[in-house]
Amino acid sequence: MTERKHDDTGVEEGTGLATKTRPATKKPSLYRVLLLNDDYTPMEFVVEVLARIFRKSPEDAARIMLHVHQNGVGMCGVYTYEVAETKVAQVMDAARRAQHPLQCTMEKE
């Protein structure tokens, strides 16, 4: 009979678990959702959209609306592709239903 060697834990030397290494998980790309200024959409409507769709506080919604008004474009938030796409569609749908020309886009961060 051959003598088997054991380490300090009592496990036979040379035995162990074979493990597979997982490939690194890639983080999803993020997209900025942007509102574009126009001369016709009421400021109150923009604040309402920011509060309802983007869950902004009244203060944040007013600040973003003023930034859009003064600079021509403003960021509403940063989201994964699917969420950003949904938010853009919701804004465009709300604007269309209210008969406002408000435009919303997304761009890769």
Swiss-Prot record:
It comes from the Bacteria. Residues 1-23 are annotated as: Disordered. Pfam families: ClpS. GO terms for biological process: protein catabolic process; proteolysis. InterPro entries: ClpS, ClpS_core, Ribosomal_bL12_C/ClpS-like. Involved in the modulation of the specificity of the ClpAP-mediated ATP-dependent protein degradation. Binds to the N-terminal domain of the chaperone ClpA. Belongs to the ClpS family. This is ATP-dependent Clp protease adapter protein ClpS. It comes from Maricaulis maris (strain MCS10) (Caulobacter maris).
